[in-house]
């Protein structure tokens, strides 16, 4: 069974792309004293400065480099890594992701779409979206920004484009090194479709990344995310946990890289469950947020609409 839907939301693509009561004075004074105390400041400090890197706690300022090192290490074996981690099913998930979004300039439209694929250095999702738009709608005008913080991953995407002979040096396609939490090079209200596939869990600040996605999308634009998630079936979850214990060992055997695979397993474990991530999408300002769990919840498609 490939797909197990928790939420069924028909015709996603038909959605137009277009404190509390006061405390007493004494209680307030007490609270102010607590907030201003050194103990209170010390307690808040770790939350401000630290984040997780897999199962480890690290300074926020260092996580970007640590994650970058992981993906530089696996860049030239990225497809192999995904095959190992998902037993090859990631290819079916990605196909479903692209088909469900069903994006492209319709024949009766005069306005091409502006896509942005974040953490998309390998190019597989971006090129798949453009292929779908052309094959189904005859769309050869929509544009694609392929964004990744890691130059090594973008090189793999450019290599893929050159090997396929289709999108290499295509004026519609731009490869851009940029931090997905900021996207400083991308104008606000400029994109119709924002996609991110198996990448957002590696952000230092996921909520900040979601807020930025909302910023760069036009009103009516769609946020669309494919990410590992939380398994809903207890037996399937047990089987997956056993598999996860073996993955770093396989990474060592296949790619001579135990540590990177160990981090990737731990990053999946730390990512929010489906409902929590849906709430984060809504917190960023998106409406009509929803999700579809795939393969018992091993991964999920999440979406939201900017209104």
From Swiss-Prot:
Pathway it works in: Cofactor biosynthesis; ubiquinone biosynthesis
Span of the transit peptide along the chain: 1-19
SUPFAM superfamilies reported for this sequence: S-adenosyl-L-methionine-dependent methyltransferases
PROSITE patterns: SAM_MT_UBIE, UBIE_1, UBIE_2
UniProt GO cellular component terms: extrinsic component of mitochondrial inner membrane; mitochondrial inner membrane; mitochondrial matrix; mitochondrion
Key words, A-Z: Membrane, Methyltransferase, Mitochondrion, Mitochondrion inner membrane, S-adenosyl-L-methionine, Transferase, Transit peptide, Ubiquinone biosynthesis
InterPro entries membership: SAM-dependent_MTases_sf, UbiE/COQ5_MeTrFase, UbiE/COQ5_MeTrFase_CS
Membrane topology category: Peripheral membrane protein
GO BP, sorted A to Z: aerobic respiration; methylation; ubiquinone biosynthetic process
Molecular function GO labels: 2-methoxy-6-polyprenyl-1,4-benzoquinol methyltransferase activity
The EC number(s) this enzyme carries: 2.1.1.201
Further comment: Present with 8100 molecules/cell in log phase SD medium.
Stored NCBIfam families: MenG_MenH_UbiE
Family, as annotated: Belongs to the class I-like SAM-binding methyltransferase superfamily. MenG/UbiE family.
Functional summary from the UniProt entry: Methyltransferase required for the conversion of 2-hexaprenyl-6-methoxy-1,4-benzoquinol (DDMQH2) to 2-hexaprenyl-3-methyl-6-methoxy-1,4-benzoquinol (DMQH2).
Protein's UniProt name: 2-methoxy-6-polyprenyl-1,4-benzoquinol methylase, mitochondrial
Species name: Saccharomyces cerevisiae (strain ATCC 204508 / S288c) (Baker's yeast)
Origin organism lineage: Eukaryota, Fungi, Dikarya, Ascomycota, Saccharomycotina
